[in-house]
Amino acid sequence: MLDKSLYELLEQNHAYASVLHWCGIDAFDYLDETLGDVCRIKNISTYNVAQALSELESNGTYSFAKLQRMSPAEMCNYLMQTHHHYSQRMLPVIEHHIQQTAIQHHHQYPQLLLLAKIFDSFKHDFLAHIQYENQVVFTYIKKLEKFTIQFSNVLWLALKDFSMGDFIMKHHQDDDDMFNIRKLLNNYEVSKEDHLAYKVLMHELKSFESDLKAHSLIEEDMLIPRAIKLEEKLTQRAHELIRLN
């Protein structure tokens, strides 16, 4: 791997570009150099870079069965970790590659100039969405789980300003956030003749959208139904206490 040029590595696996970026290497500035030479130029550990690239093949996503065994609170923590990955790693890399490719190849791909504007708007809305989930929705679900185990009237009152119905309505409104991007880029279609930078960018956008869909399914098919059951259980408990009083 260290003896291959960055061009060869990116042709081999487009996802390597983002990993190299996280390691401090802007791959498109060194396409003709070998990975080993670039690491020496940048004074970066060849072992760490090679390790990061090899770990890409065995990503750290949880299996469906493992997610099923998680409690709602554990699932919230897992989703918050993926939110962090999106905001701190995936979005910055994609945004950088959009800007870089648009500057260098906008004559061949004029749609990239519009993409830069659309993606900036998408990023703003998306970051607000995951912040809302982290701070409001997941906090609420964790309280639901806690109060189901140890119920009190005081704790129940703390949940009265929000409900899962509020989140479901907002979540459905935010579905398919990347529709305009996908439409602009013709479903991320590429050809053999396309520039490597463009092919890498399309791969990153397509992979990101695929990851978002999987993330959304975890929320909609696993987390939300469980949270609704907790909410219904607590509501029933509260109504029983009211009747007794």
For each of these PLM feature ranges, what is it?
Residues M1-N245:
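Small-residue-biased structural context
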